[in-house]
Amino acid sequence: MLRFAYSTINWGETPDLPEMFRSIAETGWDAVELFAHSLDWLGSPNRLRRDLGDLQAATMFGVIELPADRIRLGKLRRQIDYAAEIGAEAYGLVGGSRLRWRPPAPEEYDELARACEELARHGAEQGVAVAYHPHVACTIETEEEIDRLLNATQALTLCLDASHIALVGEDPIAHLRKYRDRTSYVHLKDWAKGKFVELGQGTLGIDFPAILRELDAMAFPGWVVIEMSRSDVSPAVSARANAAYLQSLGYTLTARSLAR
């Protein structure tokens, strides 16, 4: 049975935490991914647990920048430690960049792999799976680049995102099958007319029912995080629409009884 969580990305980096969590819970979700909030903003683990109420912190997400110096890596290590303290199972990373839209240089691929592997080994010591998120306009976009990253790492896992896979002309289901042993969790969102939209409203032809059936068939143990980067209405309205879409396919959003 799949476990669903909802990303906080749509509320921005400095939201009113109790209000945001109430809004997510009221729209039907049991778990969240904490997206790029500073530790200062989140507060102590005890405070965050109070703010979460009945919601579960499923995953956290951050940004890795190149060059990956010790200061930047130290901040990410502290984020991973925090993820472990609040019981998050995975920590997602996105980043690197394609300067002027050129392909990354070999040394950029190598540096990203070294930094991600260091963080992944640190996460493994804390019981947190560190996952790189292949992403348009970042160092790792395509299947070939994913292969390069995975061949250079061992502890690192993936956060596969159906929309970003489709945006580079590749098949999300083929990626799920190929990388199932290295995928700790996934992101689902839709795309239309140059922007991300609610599930089922896109124009890329992403077959979300088929993706969910594939995850079900492989008894996927990780979180399925629904993400909505920006909303034309409000974050809460989009969260409710995404919940309704999954429920229309027969899925339940209850996560508490499904803890791994």
Feature annotation, model-predicted:
Residues 20, 46-48, 79, 119, ...:
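Aromatic/hydrophobic pocket-lining residues that form π-stacking "cages" and hydrophobic walls in ligand
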Residues 11-16, 34-46, 64-74, 99-103, ...:
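Acidic-and-aromatic substrate-binding clefts and catalytic sites of carbohydrate-active enzymes
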Residues 67-158, 165-167, 236-237, 255-256:
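Active-site acidic/histidine proton-transfer and metal-coordination neighborhood
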Residues 41-59, 104, 128:
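Short acidic, glycine/proline-enriched helix-loop-strand junctions
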Residues 1-9, 56-63, 95-99:
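N-terminal small/glycine-rich loop or linker at the start of catalytic domains
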Residues 48-64, 113-123, 152-153, 208-209:
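Alpha-helix-loop-beta-strand connector modules within alpha/beta enzyme cores
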Residues 1-28, 53, 82, 87, ...:
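Histidine-acidic metal/acid-base catalytic patches
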